[in-house]
């Protein structure tokens, strides 16, 4: 899909000083083209460079149109142009249909696993990065678990889980199976994340993307706590598309392959 900014004419100066979280409302999907996977991957091979593709999976309450706009914002914020690939699963796109979206996500996990395996086959070992936000991060973990069972020899690049809406304890149990198939695994967490706080109430257990979990139990995973950053969105859940600091950190991780100890702007607070 092709996304562009609205032409606001005389109101353009107001748009320039609007809060960062308003940027999404200034974007519109201009064009959607259907292409076969071979054509898409051929084009990606020409533009991705040495790093290979970065596959992004969106979260809950994200219909196709909103997904296009959010994907465009993440691509821009993390400087992933040329290597960005968006996996769109059939979210109902309605706030009241959270459990419907959970079912839709689970239905899509085998296809996501197939996509990851095909990308690694096409681009090679450690060349494919995988990014998941919110409920989409849960889908990434479940897909990686399936990939590890089907292809224990596979080797991916960096896995980044942004505000993951997943049970912390379930992730800890699945980690030993999925951690060996990725070059690195990074989880971004924050306090004040309202959707994750609500998800905790719904499920009864702490979410992986909330700060305050005993992260020493998930050794091998680098945990980036963003709680001290300014809140760039009303919900505290969309820092990956609205926070320039998070965008810079993702660029250093995904484009430059730097571990947390090598990236600027981070302060070590524990072993992981």
Segments (PLM) and residue ranges:
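Lipolytic serine-hydrolase domain surface
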Residues: 1-48, 68-72, 76-127, 144-158, ...
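Short His-Asn-centered micro-motif
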Residues: 57-58, 133, 162-164
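Short substrate-entry loop that stabilizes the transition state in hydrolases
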Residues: 62-67
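Gly/Ala-rich beta-loop-alpha elbow adjacent to hydrolase catalytic centers
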Residues: 112, 132-136, 140
């Amino acid at each position: 899909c092709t996304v562009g900014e609205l032409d606001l004419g005389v109101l353009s100066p107001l748009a320039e000083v609007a809060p960062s979280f308003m940027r999404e409302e200034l974007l519109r999907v201009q064009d959607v083209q259907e292409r076969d996977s071979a054509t898409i991957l051929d084009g990606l091979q020409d533009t991705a460079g040495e790093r290979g593709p970065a596959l992004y999976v969106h979260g809950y309450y994200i219909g196709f149109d909103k997904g296009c706009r959010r994907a465009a914002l993440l691509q821009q914020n993390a400087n992933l142009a040329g290597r960005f690939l968006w996996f769109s699963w059939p979210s109902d796109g309605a706030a009241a249909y959270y459990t419907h979206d959970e079912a839709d996500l689970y239905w899509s996990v085998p296809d996501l696993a197939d996509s990851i395996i095909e990308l690694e086959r096409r681009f090679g070992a450690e060349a494919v990065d995988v990014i998941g936000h919110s409920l989409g991060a849960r889908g990434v973990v479940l897909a990686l678990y399936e990939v590890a069972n089907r292809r224990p020899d596979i080797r991916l690049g960096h896995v980044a889980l942004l505000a993951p809406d997943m049970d912390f304890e379930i992730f800890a149990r699945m980690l030993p199976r999925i951690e060996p198939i990725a070059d690195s695994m990074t989880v971004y967490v924050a306090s004040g994340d309202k959707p994750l706080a609500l998800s905790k109430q719904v499920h009864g257990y702490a979410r992986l993307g909330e700060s305050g979990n005993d992260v020493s139990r998930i050794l091998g995973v680098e945990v980036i706590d963003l709680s001290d950053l300014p809140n760039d969105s009303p919900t505290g859940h969309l820092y990956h598309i609205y926070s320039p600091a998070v965008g810079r950190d993702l660029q250093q991780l995904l484009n430059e392959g730097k571990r947390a100890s090598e990236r600027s702007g981070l302060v070590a607070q524990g072993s992981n």
